[in-house]
A protein has these predicted regions:
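Alpha-helical recognition segments enriched in aromatics with Gly/Pro capping
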Residues: 1-51, 164-174, 186, 197-198
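A general alpha-helix detector
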Residues: 3, 27, 42-46, 62-66, ...
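Short, surface-exposed helix-loop/turn micro-motifs enriched in polar/charged residues
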Residues: 11-14, 35, 74-77, 140, ...
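Alpha-helix N-cap and coil->helix boundary residues
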Residues: 14-17, 38, 54, 58, ...
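Short, mixed-charge aromatic SLiMs
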Residues: 23-31, 70, 110-112, 153-155, ...
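Small-residue-rich helix-loop
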Residues: 55-157
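Charged substrate- and nucleic-acid-binding regions of tRNA-handling and nucleotidyl-transfer enzymes
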Residues: 141-199
């Protein structure tokens, strides 16, 4: 609605209008005379604005129209990570793609690029991390972050050298939301199961 209005009408440089503003500000004298051009990127940017300002529970309702077999556990995980994912998502399709690591069933299929970094040494490190995670009493992003950083320091490893293999095992890819958010939203039991599937 917002984008369609701006195709042939303008009010200065303003791009985003509420329903009330559209009604109040619209005037026939501000309708452009030149042909309108469909700008997909601008449309996506406007869509991102509305996605960011949509409640997570409302987004979940839309997601469930496509993903009809979500369990209650998956829904809970999705609601937990949606605030992070919706910041950069421009379409519902992008959101669902970003949530695929939650929607996938175990065992998670690891893509070829991810397999390359899962060396024997990396798997040994993940095994150590798993044991530390099992002892974590309070499961949240701040405690998970501290645990992983402490491990990287104690083992004299770059953080990416533990984050990438862990991300590969938990999501099957090397690109996903922050590793802390992934661990947090999946929950301790699911994280341990996914690590065990691969190790």
């Amino acid at each position: 609605k917002n984008y369609l209005l701006r195709l042939g009408w303008s009010h200065g440089d303003k791009e985003i209008f509420s329903q009330e503003e559209m009604i109040k500000l619209f005037s026939l004298k501000n309708i452009g005379k030149s042909s309108s051009r469909l700008d997909i990127e601008k449309l996506k940017n406007i869509n991102n604005h509305y996605i960011k300002n949509t409640y997570e529970k409302d987004l979940l309702v839309i997601i469930k129209k496509s993903e009809k077999t979500l369990s209650k556990v998956q829904e809970k995980s999705i609601l937990k990570i949606l605030p992070e994912i919706k910041k950069s998502s421009k379409t519902i399709v992008e959101i669902i793609a970003s949530l695929s690591f939650i929607i996938k069933e175990r065992p998670i299929k690891i893509n070829e690029d991810s397999k390359k970094i899962l060396t024997l040494e990396e798997k040994k490190n993940i095994e150590k991390i798993k044991k530390m995670l099992q002892t974590l009493d309070t499961w949240d992003t701040s405690n998970i972050e501290q645990l992983l950083k402490d491990f990287s320091i104690s083992e004299e490893l770059k953080f990416k050298d533990i984050a990438l293999p862990l991300r590969a095992i938990l999501t099957g890819t090397l690109s996903s939301p922050s590793i802390y958010n992934i661990l947090d939203c999946l929950g301790k039991d699911e994280v341990i199961k996914r690590i065990n599937d691969i190790l």
